[in-house]
């Protein structure tokens, strides 16, 4: 209430979607935290509802149309020419996938395949070629990013058939090189619209084979995400690139107006190869828009200020 904002919760489920729509239409603005996939459910009912609400006047963040541009793995392909990019490829059909993946695995080493929409490591695979004997099926070693996953070896054709489900509902698969510095950790850059509001560093275990003790052992669990403010010294080079270069370039490429950027979103970076002078580089591995939490302690104040500003614009104050 310090900024004059009266907030109230709105709990969504498909069974009472109409009641939620009626509630949202009485609001000036709506902040949305809903995973793209959760316990077998998707946003196929929620997203049209939010589009309808936004068309009738209330401001919605993040708008579903913005999520479809930013918060999907395809953004890794569309922005691969930016400084955060890598040798990224996109497969829109099973035919493209079957034609391009086998030679790429032979020539480019381990890859990471990602379904377009998902969370929690669902549909994200480290894939590497084990053997490709002449006249016999090629064998892969694959590891999914889901917690407690274990590596498995199987024929290439069998794995590609398994992945065909990711093309349903106009889906696609993004293909990136595996980053060898993954054990160094991941940096989550928290954004309030086009400004950095904090960072989180975490030693992740996804796509790393579990220790001998097993995938459910303490040693196999990810470390805590250590939160930092936007001014944290270790991340100032990344902050400068995000604010001055990469975010402006991204919204231009994606055709997103600056005023449509989500109030809170984050970009996950892995450490790329060091430069000749020993400086770190950063490779984007995901943008999260649909349900960003937890957040640094400094972020809520920035979210509140941005929300207040957007609401004033919506009302024409």
Please tell me what each predicted stretch does.
Residues 31-33, 112, 174:
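Structural motif
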Residues 1-103:
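Conserved N-proximal alpha/beta basic substrate-recognition cap immediately N-terminal to
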Residues 5, 84, 170, 256-263:
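Short secondary-structure junctions
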Residues 14, 36-37, 67, 117-119, ...:
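Short, solvent-exposed loop/turn segments at secondary-structure junctions
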């Amino acid at each position: 209430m310090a900024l004059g904002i009266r907030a109230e919760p709105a709990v969504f489920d498909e069974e009472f979607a109409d009641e939620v729509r009626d509630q949202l239409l009485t609001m000036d603005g709506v902040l949305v935290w809903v995973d793209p996939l959760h316990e077998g459910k998707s946003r196929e009912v929620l997203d049209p509802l939010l589009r309808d609400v936004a068309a009738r006047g209330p401001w919605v963040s993040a708008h579903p149309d913005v999520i479809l541009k930013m918060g999907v793995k395809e953004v890794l392909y569309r922005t691969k020419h930016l400084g955060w990019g890598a040798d990224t490829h996109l497969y829109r059909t099973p035919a493209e996938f079957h034609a391009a993946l086998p030679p790429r695995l032979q020539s480019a080493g381990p890859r990471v395949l990602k379904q377009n929409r998902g969370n929690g490591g669902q549909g994200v695979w480290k894939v590497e070629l084990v053997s490709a004997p002449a006249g016999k099926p090629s064998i892969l070693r694959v590891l999914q990013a889901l917690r407690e996953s274990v590596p498995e070896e199987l024929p290439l054709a069998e794995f590609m058939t398994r992945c065909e489900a990711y093309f349903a509902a106009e889906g696609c698969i993004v293909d990136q090189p595996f980053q060898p510095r993954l054990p160094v950790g991941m940096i989550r850059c928290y954004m309030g619209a086009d400004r950095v509001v904090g960072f989180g560093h975490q030693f992740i275990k996804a796509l790393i084979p579990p220790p001998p003790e097993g995938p459910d052992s303490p040693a196999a669990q990810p470390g805590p995400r250590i939160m930092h403010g936007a001014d944290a010294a270790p991340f100032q080079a990344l902050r400068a690139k995000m604010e001055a270069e990469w975010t402006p370039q991204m919204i231009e490429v994606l055709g997103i107006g600056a005023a449509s950027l989500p109030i809170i979103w984050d970009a996950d970076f892995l450490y790329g190869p060091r430069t000749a002078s020993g400086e770190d580089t950063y490779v984007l591995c995901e943008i999260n828009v649909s349900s960003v939490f937890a957040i640094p302690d400094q972020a809520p104040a920035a979210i509140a200020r941005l929300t207040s500003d957007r609401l004033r614009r919506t009302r024409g104050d």
